């Protein structure tokens, strides 16, 4: 596998892969970088490189998210056993944009399919392979998620005439 293919994949898919990984972990850039490193060390390139990258990113992000949750639980237990030194600020959280919040409020399966299809450019067949479902189920999740997003964001989709 040549550096041209790797460079082209990074240029065209890295941003969407970061967005995809962000669903599960707080370090999506690291996960995507690790996925590209794994891709570069493959003796034989996968048949569908983009779908392969999404699979590796998904697995890595889920693992990183789980590790972060375990670390957070451990740190919370340790912090609960010591007296607090500071009063927490009431406005510690950052307000995200409305669309980002709406997307984050979707069920994970719907959010995953929407991000993979819109920003990742994956087909519903590739998404089905990635999520272990059928293409029709992936499409149903996509349509349902878009419907919820439209409702929450107040976006009206023009209807098509029925014959």
Task: Indicate where each model-derived feature is located.
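Structural recognition of an alpha-helix C-terminal capping motif at a helix-to-coil junction
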Residues: 30-37, 47-59
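A short pre-motif secondary-structure segment
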Residues: 113-117
